[in-house]
């Protein structure tokens, strides 16, 4: 058949599966996508029109210019009867789009169980992967919270512990979304509760990252290990970060809102009740994208809570047995970080008022305002870094050294005069005046580090 012949037949409405472009009401040829009348009928779930087109000789496997079949469109809408009509007419359940997307993946994403069952009964491949990310139908079901679809797919041979090209699993998809029913369905189907992402992150930590605290408790109840730290830190460390991220200073980027009934403080108790070590030491630095100046190697959850002056968590961890005097590998104490050592102005969480209260708490616990860490930083360096006048005066009243010079060659006065990390030079004129009046001195200002 020549192109000109097709044009004539189109004008007469005589090509099976195609209709006149002008007949908008009857399921037309889409000149952009080249959808056929069969595509339109499948998309609407219009079984009568679908059957009429097939009876007229329409090819059940015809694709539009994007490689999409009528079967995939029927699966998108969850039109079970239309799916069965197409399969009976010979539609290929494994015909994939250009990106490797199969009808079963589409049906799993939509979540209609009968659609999935119909495809599987006609030979749909449950382990097929799309070519972009290497995802399977089971992953799509998990990512869309379709717990009812999990069992049929796994029973048909879907890989419950399969991984995407980047190492994500169905369980991790469901955990990231916090859907307990889907997580339970995957675990009941054989998903490995102790699996990790390639960097060692456990499902428990993924739940905590996303503030899915109800799910975190559920994972603990099912046997998740609260001491797991293959990625370099535990769920308890993660909870401190999730509760008060670096960008929380001015509430422009608030913490994730917990989903469900379990609060973050209740989760702290649950983690410890299930065996979490309140004095666990961090072994790696996270690549979380937040600006951080503290060496977190050897940091405990308590030290991290002190860094963001989260007094509620600090006190709770103390009640649960935390040692408040443990330091990081630089010898930086909880009092030092609470005072402001390693803060990033306007981004580090916590107010100056909270910092003062936290410093007083640490003094009650035996920490000292005269401690100097291995970087030469003192509590007074920290209080000036965070611009806390009342805190600075309190520290001086308690005996803090006025003009100690750290390893960078900075005294507290140097910082008040505007020398700071990287390309950030923030000056604190009021503190500069206070320090000068008390006799503070400053060494010659060094070049800013490159």
Predicted feature residues:
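Bacterial N-terminal signal peptides
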Residues: 2-17
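Ankyrin repeat boundary/linker residues
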Residues: 31, 64, 97, 130-131, ...
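Ankyrin repeat domain, specifically the short helix-to-loop turn at the C-terminus of the second helix
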Residues: 54-59, 84-92, 117-125, 151-159, ...
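Ankyrin-repeat-protein effector appendages
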Residues: 21-37, 189, 222, 241, ...
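Conserved ankyrin/ankyrin-like repeat signature
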Residues: 49, 81-82, 114-115, 148-149, ...
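Ankyrin repeat A-helix N-terminal signature
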Residues: 40-44, 73-79, 106-112, 140-146, ...
